[in-house]
A protein has these predicted regions:
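C-terminal substrate-recognition "lid" of short-chain dehydrogenase/reductases
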Residues: 2, 119, 134, 178, ...
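Conserved glycine-rich cofactor-binding loop
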Residues: 7, 14-15
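The beta1-alpha1 cofactor-binding region of Rossmann-like NAD(H)/NADP(H)-dependent oxidoreductases
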Residues: 40, 61-72, 104, 217-218
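Substrate-binding pocket helix/loop in short-chain dehydrogenase/reductase
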Residues: 98-99, 103-111, 193, 204
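Active-site helix of classical SDR
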Residues: 122, 158, 166
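Alpha-helical segment proximal to the catalytic Tyr-Lys
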Residues: 127, 171-175, 232
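Residue(s) in the substrate-gating loop at a strand-loop-helix junction
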Residues: 142
Length: 247
C-alpha cells in the first residue's frame, strides 16, 4: 500500500496508537501532520520516529476541543500543502468514575475532546476534501462504544457518538468520494494499560480468544489500509481490533 503524495493529519499523535499511526502513514509515503495538545517532547519523538521510518512530517499544536484553534490550524496546514487527503481522529482522554460520583466537568471534558473534537476536525477538513473530490476520514472509537463498561459512562458515550458521526458523515460525504470509517480497538498495550497488575492482566487475557493484548501497531495497520486506495469501496464501517474479545 502506498500513500505517496498524500497529506495526513493525525490528532493525538504524540503517543500510543496515534504515534504508531503517524509512523505507518509516513512510512507508506504520506506527509504527516502530528497533532498534540500538551506534550511537545512526546510529539517531537513521534516526528523522530517518522523520519526514522523514512517519512516526513511536522508537529502542530492545537486542542481539538477548541473549535476556533482547530479550524485555524487545519486551514493553515491546507494552505501549506494545498490539500488534505487523510484525517485520523485519534485525540482522546478518559476520566473514569462511577456515575453517581462523576463530576460534570469530567463528563464534559471527555465528550468535548473525544466526540466534539472529532466533529471540529471533520468540519474543518471536509470542505477541502469535497473540493478535491476525495479523501479518507478514520475515527478511532473503542470496543466500549459497543459493549459499554462500568465506570466509563463518559468515555463509552463519547466513543459511541463517534460511531454515529462516522456513519452519518459516510452517507453525507460519499457523493464526493470521501470514505469515512471507524476502528474500534479493544485492550491495547499502551501506557494506559501499563499500570495494570499481573493478576489483572492475566484475568483479562483469559477473555481474549487470541490470548494477548493488542499493540498500537495492530490498530495502525488497519488505519493504514482504510487510508489507502485499496479501501476505496469501504465506507461507514466500524472495524474491531480486539483479538476476538468482542464479536
Amino acid at each position: 500500500m502506498t500513500l505517496k503524495d498524500k497529506v495526513a493529519l493525525v490528532t493525538g499523535g504524540s503517543r500510543g496508537i496515534g504515534r504508531s499511526v503517524c509512523v505507518r502513514l509516513a512510512g507508506a509515503g504520506a506527509f504527516v501532520f502530528i497533532n498534540y495538545a500538551r506534550n511537545e517532547e512526546a510529539a517531537r519523538e513521534t516526528l523522530r520516529l517518522v523520519g526514522q521510518a523514512g517519512g516526513n512530517g511536522k508537529v502542530v499544536r492545537f486542542d481539538v476541543a477548541d473549535d476556533r484553534a482547530t479550524a485555524e490550524a487545519i486551514a493553515a496546514l491546507i494552505r501549506e500543502k494545498g490539500r488534505i487527503d487523510i484525517l485520523v481522529n485519534n485525540a482522546g482522554e478518559s476520566r473514569d468514575g462511577l456515575l453517581v460520583r462523576m463530576k460534570e466537568q469530567d463528563w464534559g471534558r471527555v465528550l468535548d475532546t473525544n466526540l466534539t473534537g472529532a466533529f471540529h476536525c471533520c468540519r474543518a477538513a471536509a470542505y477541502a476534501m469535497m473540493k478535491q473530490r476525495g479523501g479518507r476520514i478514520i475515527n478511532v472509537s473503542s470496543l466500549v462504544a459497543l459493549s459499554g463498561n462500568a465506570g466509563q459512562a463518559n468515555y463509552s458515550a463519547s466513543k459511541a457518538g463517534l460511531i454515529g458521526l462516522t456513519k452519518s458523515l459516510a452517507r453525507e460525504l460519499a457523493p464526493r468520494a470521501i470514505c469515512v470509517n471507524a476502528v474500534a480497538p479493544g485492550l491495547i498495550d499502551t501506557d494506559m494499560t501499563s499500570a495494570m497488575t499481573e493478576e489483572q492482566r492475566e484475568k483479562i487475557l483469559e477473555g481474549i480468544p487470541l490470548s494477548r493484548l493488542g499493540t498500537p501497531d495492530d490498530v495502525a495497520g488497519v488505519v493504514l489500509f482504510l487510508a489507502s486506495d485499496e479501501a476505496g469501496y469501504i465506507t461507514g464501517q466500524v472495524i474491531g481490533v480486539n483479538g476476538g474479545l468482542y464479536m
